[in-house]
């Protein structure tokens, strides 16, 4: 345990262990600590006579401490000391051995002896409460510190009287010894509480200090609320020069100055006159302004002028400069001007109006009287009854407003000010029979022990319904009891439960009652039991006490003249007319925060910019969170412009500065006060405007929703210089600027926003939007983020069509205003699957499996036509307009496509509108897309996007994926491979060196190529245009959009089938040409296989073996295997080198290509790794009659259909081979060892078709590397398909002929077989006729010998 021993004002905490120690030991330890506290050495003499308990009991020196004292008790030491230090309160003892000079030492004479003489029994005085009430010649000082130099007894007994320190009596009131001013004038005033007394205090005379060491109504030591100090307040005297003012320092600092209270006492009874006005429904004919004192306090309404011929002038009801301080039972003092107007309008609904008026002659006296009440006003303005009516406005006195007529139905609040006005009206409306007493200053010296709070607060009655998650809050208590009882406080609000759902209970609230049971004296465990006793689904009633902070708002660009009484020379527009004449109103809301952290204020804001000059128009409310403080308050609306927040103006600032001001003010002031004060500008419709000043609302005018008493309206004349706040009601431009209808001028509310500004669009209510648009519709700022229904181009074109009265905003459409399945309202699971009603629409979801791309699309505004707007068609985001919304990922963009398609906005057939390309696309992907969309023909544009029957989930993947290993879907795998390779090859410029006929052919091929665009491109193709010629399509865009809507789904299916048949017919024709070439190539391949290095060339074509080496030489098997291993390391076939040919060759042929095909096939048969075989094929096509096969393999054609066509083509193979063989030129063989491939290309230019294929990078993937190695990117899907078909054909021939006849063993066949098995084997030389073409039977026998019996089928 530990106790606190008080030596005068110095408190020493002494640890006592378990308390089993004597009081004598405690005194010794306390003295030692006291010496250290006052910085004295151990020889400093201190004598402690006794220790007294707080309740007055004296502790015996032999008592055990734990028996006579409790833990944390405070004990008072009655002591003497050698040389009292001059340290004041004893808490600062840094000046060791030094003393401050005595200012008044000379005036005190030579009596420098200490007031604390050695202890004498006769000098001991027992001070008790009864003794304090007696007339003892004791003088009370500010402190009982022994540092005060004692005064002689003659001084105490002499005729000195004390006065309260004030500006009239600047008595020094501190711990330093001072002098007393002799009382020569005035007599002390007394109150009925205590008598006129003088006291003298010694350190031993402290038995009456028991209260100061307890947490009760006088917990602070001898503070201003202490009863002994209260004597100073009760002995107030008026000095002879009481009217003079002195601005010197008044002590004690912070004490209420009483010097101003002794001016001549003007009572409100002498000033106020009562004016009774019968209400006949007509206007009063007065113009009023707020009447403010010099300190800014509102003292009422000042009658500025009277209308000529009005009721007030005719009946002589008021005079100019009269001050109205009360209307009926509503006090107008210390009220905001908006509240005063509200009370004025309420009074205009009563049959008789009682005005309490201070005449103009007494106005100065009334203002002086208000100054004497100022301090008391600030101490009581935050009473529980006036928490929302106090002076919290942005400008308490100077807001000059043209106001609207009454809107409220409910009667005004019954609120008492700090001083009651006379003539307090009775419910009947008549004045009382006797006036109330004049205001007096009452100084309370005690505070209720039940509250004991630093700030004055309010009581709240809260009912919570206990559910399955409990009440949802926790409680705590103080560790030190107050007067024997521990207060119970709400510790925190749990994230689930009744408290957070209700939203009114706050952390820090003090519980007063639970279900009517007073909690005073109850422990925390008892309160918990009481709360837990509430049954399930039962209601618990809580009475809580909440402390309130004073809120002094900042000025809102208010001029000093506005804070004072308006002068007669002011302009007429500064007068306040109580009738509206504008088109918008300014409202003030004080929104209480939840303080539970559920949603903060709960609003999302946006910044608007002007379309003409890009000027910032202000901050507007974008949306309101359902469940937030603003939603529960219910008064803030979407598109309200924020004028000021917590007294800080947002006008005249850029949107960025205003947003920063908004964040800072809401995060500091809002959290500090628990309430956010908002001033907003809201448009009013003309039908709600009233006519006459001060007149009650007529029956023909509907009464709108009642405003809360915390609501106010302020002047638009104060903000007349702001852009968009024009007073002309005929200008729709001002309305559009102030309301911001387009909904797209948004700064991102989710970037660096505090928790109070978290953006969660969860409001189920329809936004209240103006019915008219303007021709000044603004464009979106670049910070626009999110999926917004409104479109900037829509507003712009609608304004062109009808600038005065345009069609309704898309936001007004209730169908578009709220969509449960709309974008931004779906969870992650709903975005993927839930919103699609049938399986066919899931194709858009499957596109999310494609690789992500950064598709940044720049803004484009003109998307819809004027005709569409006039026709009343809803403005929706279709086609490229979806891309205008900046999307954080491809997935969110595809979700937008899926949603619009689900709603029927994207028909199956759509011309491709052009959009300028943004940043970040992959170059190869962009090039492929650009080629697909590059200048489509107008006639054939309808054939842009096709869907084939083979579309599956796999077909929607990106074309850059590797070849599939699924053996049951070779055609699909090849198809994806071809899509990827041919899209990569689309970078070339096909316009180079082409005739008009070739260009037309290329366009036809590009159209065919579009038919194979699948998967992701199928969805994105309806949205984006990645091409370059953006402006070319603007003329055709309107017609195309109309055409696309005229097609039905049935016509689309028919057209798709016809197009597919046409594509298949073209593919069949092309493959027939390929088959003829292959048959001839096989015959030549037979010749090349049996040829040798030393044989003569025929037709200028050297053998394949001769192209690989300078002179054929036998190679050992070891060398052959080493070479094979070397090629295998780079995953390249050994025999894939291109054959350098003679420099005298006149025309290249396709023999070499067929030969390499054959050798690579044999090499693949010997390879055991299936995966390696799939990646080791790349072929050249240097034959002159090669056609750019851009169509082959682009669509899924089954192998069975291809084999059927192949069998038909075999019958013509012999004739075709014979014709081509006979047409070859004859030329003698030359050594080709020294001729490189580059020299061959330079000396002999190939034919035109081959030259174009060679120069075009589109076909670069068809050709291998010039050094004979395969390029890693050189896979060609078309050649792979040809190889697959060839191998399948040969496999079938082998199986058929093996059944008919056994294989023959010829030396040439054997040599060929050995050559395939061992590449180093050189066949024996022998005569062979090269001028006779081989028969097809030889090719068949060659296939049987060269193909192993257990060869594996080749799959790509």
UniProtKB/Swiss-Prot annotation:
Pfam family, one: Par3_HAL_N_term
Effect of residue 349 to H: In NTD; uncertain significance
Acidic residues bias spans: 939-953
Ranges for region Interaction with PRKCI and PRKCZ: 712-936
Effect on the protein upon substituting residue 962 to A: Abolishes phosphorylation by AURKA
Biased composition regions of type Low complexity, renumbered to the chain: 91-100, 1196-1205
Compositional bias of kind Polar residues: 154-163, 171-187, 204-224, 968-982, 1136-1149, 1221-1245, 1337-1346
Major subcellular site: cytoplasm
Post-translational events: Acetylated. Deacetylated by SIRT2, thereby inhibiting Schwann cell peripheral myelination.
Keywords associated with the record: Acetylation, Cell cycle, Cell division, Cell junction, Cell membrane, Coiled coil, Cytoplasm, Cytoskeleton, Differentiation, Disease variant, Lipid-binding, Membrane, Phosphoprotein, Repeat, Tight junction
Subcellular location: Cytoplasm; Endomembrane system; Cell junction; Cell junction, Tight junction
GO molecular function, one term: phosphatidylinositol binding
Stretch list, region Disordered: 81-100, 154-262, 408-448, 865-886, 932-1025, 1129-1356
Residue ranges of domain PDZ in the record: 271-359, 461-546, 590-677
Annotated spans, Interaction with FRMD4A: 935-1356
Cellular component GO terms, alphabetical: adherens junction; apical junction complex; apical plasma membrane; bicellular tight junction; cell cortex; cell junction; cell-cell junction; cytoskeleton
The protein's role, per its UniProt record: Adapter protein involved in asymmetrical cell division and cell polarization processes. Seems to play a central role in the formation of epithelial tight junctions. Targets the phosphatase PTEN to cell junctions. Involved in Schwann cell peripheral myelination. Association with PARD6B may prevent the interaction of PARD3 with F11R/JAM1, thereby preventing tight junction assembly. The PARD6-PARD3 complex links GTP-bound Rho small GTPases to atypical protein kinase C proteins. Required for establishment of neuronal polarity and normal axon formation in cultured hippocampal neurons.
Other comment: Antibodies against PARD3 are present in sera from patients with cutaneous T-cell lymphomas.
Oligomeric form and interacting partners: Interacts (via PDZ 1 domain) with F11R/JAM1, PARD6A and PARD6B. Interacts with PRCKI and CDH5. Interacts (via PDZ 3 domain) with PTEN (via C-terminus). Part of a complex with PARD6A or PARD6B, PRKCI or PRKCZ and CDC42 or RAC1. Component of a complex whose core is composed of ARHGAP17, AMOT, PALS1, PATJ and PARD3/PAR3. Interacts with LIMK2, AURKA and AURKB. Component of the Par polarity complex, composed of at least phosphorylated PRKCZ, PARD3 and TIAM1. Directly interacts with TIAM1 and TIAM2. Interacts with ECT2, FBF1 and SIRT2. Interacts (via coiled-coil domain) with FRMD4A.
Related illness: Neural tube defects: Congenital malformations of the central nervous system and adjacent structures related to defective neural tube closure during the first trimester of pregnancy. Failure of neural tube closure can occur at any level of the embryonic axis. Common NTD forms include anencephaly, myelomeningocele and spina bifida, which result from the failure of fusion in the cranial and spinal region of the neural tube. NTDs have a multifactorial etiology encompassing both genetic and environmental components.
Family: Belongs to the PAR3 family.
Comment text on domains: Contains a conserved N-terminal oligomerization domain (NTD) that is involved in oligomerization and is essential for proper subapical membrane localization. The second PDZ domain mediates interaction with membranes containing phosphoinositol lipids.
Protein name (record): Partitioning defective 3 homolog
Organismal lineage: Eukaryota, Metazoa, Chordata, Craniata, Vertebrata
């Amino acid at each position: 345990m530990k106790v606190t021993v008080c030596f005068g004002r110095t408190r020493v905490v002494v640890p006592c262990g378990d308390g089993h120690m004597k009081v004598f030991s405690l005194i010794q330890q306390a003295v030692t600590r006291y010496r250290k506290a006052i910085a004295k050495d151990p020889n400093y003499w201190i004598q402690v006579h006794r220790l007294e308990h707080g309740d007055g009991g004296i502790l015996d020196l032999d008592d055990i401490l734990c028996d006579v004292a409790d833990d944390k008790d405070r004990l008072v030491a009655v002591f003497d000391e050698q040389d009292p230090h001059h340290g004041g309160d004893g808490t600062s003892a840094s000046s060791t051995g030094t003393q401050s000079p005595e200012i008044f030492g000379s005036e005190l004479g030579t009596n420098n002896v200490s007031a604390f003489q050695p202890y004498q029994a006769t000098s001991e005085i027992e001070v008790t409460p009864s003794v304090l009430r007696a007339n003892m010649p004791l003088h009370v000082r500010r402190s009982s510190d022994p540092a005060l130099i004692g005064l002689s007894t003659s001084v105490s007994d002499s005729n000195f009287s004390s006065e309260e320190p004030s500006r009239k009596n600047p008595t020094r009131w501190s711990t330093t010894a001072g002098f007393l001013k002799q009382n020569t004038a005035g007599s002390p005033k007394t109150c009925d509480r205590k008598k006129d007394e003088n006291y003298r205090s010694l350190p031993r005379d402290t038995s009456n200090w028991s209260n100061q060491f307890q947490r009760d109504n006088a917990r602070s030591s001898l503070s201003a609320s202490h009863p002994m100090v209260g004597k100073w307040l009760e002995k107030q005297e008026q000095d002879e020069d009481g009217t003079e003012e002195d601005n010197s320092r008044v002590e004690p600092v912070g004490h209420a100055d009483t010097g101003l209270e002794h001016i001549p006492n003007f009572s409100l009874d002498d000033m106020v006159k009562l004016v009774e006005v019968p209400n006949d429904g007509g206007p009063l004919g007065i113009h009023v302004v707020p009447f403010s004192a010099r300190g800014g306090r509102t003292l009422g309404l000042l009658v500025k002028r009277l209308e000529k011929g009005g009721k007030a002038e005719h009946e002589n009801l008021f005079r100019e400069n009269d001050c109205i301080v009360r209307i009926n039972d509503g006090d107008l003092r210390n009220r905001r001007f908006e509240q005063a107007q509200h009370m004025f309008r309420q009074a205009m609904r009563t049959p008789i109006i009682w005005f309490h008026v201070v005449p103009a002659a007494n106005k100065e006296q009334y203002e002086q009287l208000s100054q004497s009440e100022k301090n008391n006003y600030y101490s009581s303005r935050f009473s529980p009854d006036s928490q929302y009516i106090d002076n919290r406005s942005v400008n308490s006195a100077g807001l000059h407003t043209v106001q609207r007529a009454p809107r409220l139905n409910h009667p005004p609040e019954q609120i008492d000010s700090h001083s009651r006005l006379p003539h307090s009206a009775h419910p009947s409306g008549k004045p009382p029979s006797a006036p109330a007493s004049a205001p007096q200053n009452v100084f309370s010296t005690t505070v209720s022990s039940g509250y004991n709070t630093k700030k004055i607060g309010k009581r709240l009655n809260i009912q919570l319904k206990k559910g399955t998650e409990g009440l949802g809050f926790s409680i705590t208590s103080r560790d030190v009891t107050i007067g024997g009882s521990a207060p119970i406080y709400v510790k925190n609000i749990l994230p689930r439960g009744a408290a957070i759902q209700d939203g009114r209970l706050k952390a820090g609230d003090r519980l007063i009652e639970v279900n009517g049971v007073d909690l005073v004296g109850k422990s925390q465990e008892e309160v918990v039991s009481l709360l837990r006793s509430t049954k399930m689904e039962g209601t618990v009633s809580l009475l809580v006490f909440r402390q309130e902070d004073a809120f002094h708002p900042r000025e809102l660009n208010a001029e000093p003249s506005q804070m004072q009484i308006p002068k007669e020379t002011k302009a007429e527009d500064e007068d306040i007319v109580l009738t509206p004449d504008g088109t918008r109103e300014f409202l003030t809301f004080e929104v209480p925060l939840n303080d539970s952290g559920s949603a903060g204020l709960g609003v999302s804001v946006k910044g608007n910019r002007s379309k003409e000059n890009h000027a910032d128009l202000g901050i507007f409310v974008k949306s309101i969170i359902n469940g937030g403080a603003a939603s529960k308050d219910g008064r803030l609306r979407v598109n309200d412009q924020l004028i000021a927040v917590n007294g800080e103006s947002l006008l005249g600032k850029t949107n960025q500065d205003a947003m920063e001001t908004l964040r800072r003010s809401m995060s500091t002031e809002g959290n500090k006060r628990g309430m956010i004060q908002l001033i907003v500008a809201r448009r009013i419709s003309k039908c709600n405007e009233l006519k006459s000043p001060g007149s009650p609302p007529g029956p023909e005018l509907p009464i709108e929703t009642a405003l809360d008493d915390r609501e106010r309206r302020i002047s638009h004349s104060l903000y007349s210089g702001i852009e968009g706040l024009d007073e002309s009601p005929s200008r729709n431009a001002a309305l559009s600027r102030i309301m911001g209808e387009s909904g797209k001028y948004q700064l991102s509310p989710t970037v660096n926003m505090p928790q109070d500004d978290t953006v969660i669009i969860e409001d189920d209510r329809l936004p209240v939007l103006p019915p008219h648009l303007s021709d000044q519709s603004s464009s979106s700022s670049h910070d626009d983020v999110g999926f917004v229904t409104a479109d900037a181009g829509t507003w712009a074109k609608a304004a062109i069509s009808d600038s005065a009265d345009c069609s309704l905003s898309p936001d007004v459409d209730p169908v578009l205003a709220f969509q449960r399945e709309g974008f931004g309202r779906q969870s992650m699971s709903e975005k993927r699957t839930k919103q699609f009603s049938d399986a066919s629409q899931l194709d858009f979801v499957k596109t999310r499996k494609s690789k992500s791309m950064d598709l940044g699309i720049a803004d484009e505004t003109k998307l819809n036509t004027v005709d569409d707007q006039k026709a009343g068609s809803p403005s929706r985001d279709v086609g490229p307009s979806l891309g205008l919304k900046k999307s954080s990922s491809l997935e969110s963009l595809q979700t937008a496509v899926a949603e619009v398609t689900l709603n029927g906005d994207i028909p199956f057939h759509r011309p491709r509108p052009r959009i300028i390309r943004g940043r970040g696309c992959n170059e190869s992907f962009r090039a492929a897309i650009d080629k697909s969309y590059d200048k489509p023909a107008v006639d054939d544009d309808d054939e842009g996007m096709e869907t084939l029957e083979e579309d599956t989930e796999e077909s929607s993947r990106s074309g850059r994926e590797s070849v599939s290993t699924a053996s049951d879907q070779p055609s699909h795998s090849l198809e994806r491979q071809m899509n990827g390779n041919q899209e990569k090859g689309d970078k070339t410029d096909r316009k180079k060196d082409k005739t008009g006929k070739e260009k037309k052919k290329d366009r036809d091929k590009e159209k065919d190529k579009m038919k194979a665009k699948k998967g992701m491109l199928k969805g994105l193709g309806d949205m984006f245009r990645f091409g370059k010629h953006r402006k070319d399509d603007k003329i055709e865009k309107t017609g195309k959009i109309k055409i696309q809507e005229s097609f039905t789904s049935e016509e689309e299916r028919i057209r798709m089938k016809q197009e597919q048949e046409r594509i298949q017919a073209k593919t069949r024709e092309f493959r027939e040409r390929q088959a003829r070439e292959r048959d001839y190539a096989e015959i030549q391949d037979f010749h090349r296989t049996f040829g040798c290095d030393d044989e003569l060339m025929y037709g200028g074509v050297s053998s394949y073996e001769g192209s690989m080496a300078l002179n054929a030489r036998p190679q050992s098997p070891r060398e052959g295997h080493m070479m094979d291993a070397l090629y295998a390391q780079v995953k390249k076939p050994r025999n894939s080198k291109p054959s350098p040919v003679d420099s005298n060759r006149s025309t290249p042929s396709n023999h070499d290509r067929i030969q390499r095909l054959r050798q690579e096939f044999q090499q693949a048969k010997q390879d055991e790794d299936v995966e390696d075989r799939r990646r080791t094929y790349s072929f050249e096509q240097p034959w002159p009659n090669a056609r750019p096969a851009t169509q082959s393999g682009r669509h899924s054609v089954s192998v069975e259909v291809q084999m059927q066509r192949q069998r038909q083509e075999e019958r013509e193979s012999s004739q075709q081979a014979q014709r081509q063989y006979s047409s070859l030129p004859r030329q003698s063989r030359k050594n080709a060892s020294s001729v490189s491939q580059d020299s061959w290309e330079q000396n002999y230019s190939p034919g035109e078709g081959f030259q174009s294929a060679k120069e075009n990078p589109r076909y670069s993937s068809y050709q291998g590397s010039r050094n004979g190695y395969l390029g890693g990117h050189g896979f060609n899907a078309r050649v792979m398909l040809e190889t697959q078909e060839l191998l399948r054909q040969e496999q079938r021939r082998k199986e058929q002929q093996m059944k008919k006849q056994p294989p023959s063993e010829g030396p040439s066949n054997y040599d060929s077989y050995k050559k395939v098995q061992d590449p180093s084997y050189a066949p024996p030389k022998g005569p062979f006729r090269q001028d006779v073409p081989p028969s097809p039977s030889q090719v068949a026998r060659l296939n049987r010998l060269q193909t192993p019996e257990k060869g594996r089928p080749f799959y790509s």
